[in-house]
Swiss-Prot record:
This is Large ribosomal subunit protein uL29. Keywords: Ribonucleoprotein, Ribosomal protein. SUPFAM superfamilies: Ribosomal protein L29 (L29p). InterPro entries: Ribosomal_uL29, Ribosomal_uL29_sf. Gene3D superfamilies: 1.10.287.310. It comes from Pelagibacter ubique (strain HTCC1062). Belongs to the universal ribosomal protein uL29 family. GO terms for molecular function: structural constituent of ribosome. The keyword Ribonucleoprotein applies. One of its GO terms (cellular component) is ribonucleoprotein complex. The keyword Ribosomal protein applies. It holds the Pfam family Ribosomal_L29. It comes from the Bacteria.
Amino acid sequence: MKKQEIKKLSKDEVIKNIDKLKKDLFNFRFQKINSQVTDPSKIGQTKKTIARLKTTLKGKLNA
């Protein structure tokens, strides 16, 4: 997700996306352990997207 897309989301949508990405991250890590990962860079991308979403959520909660 791009920063502009994230800023347009509501608080509830941000929370749902964080939960979904955390599940995806768990699955990527599990695949990595079993050597079934197709694209290892997705782990880093997912972590960065979660961080962006959390930052946006924090800003919306403080506003």
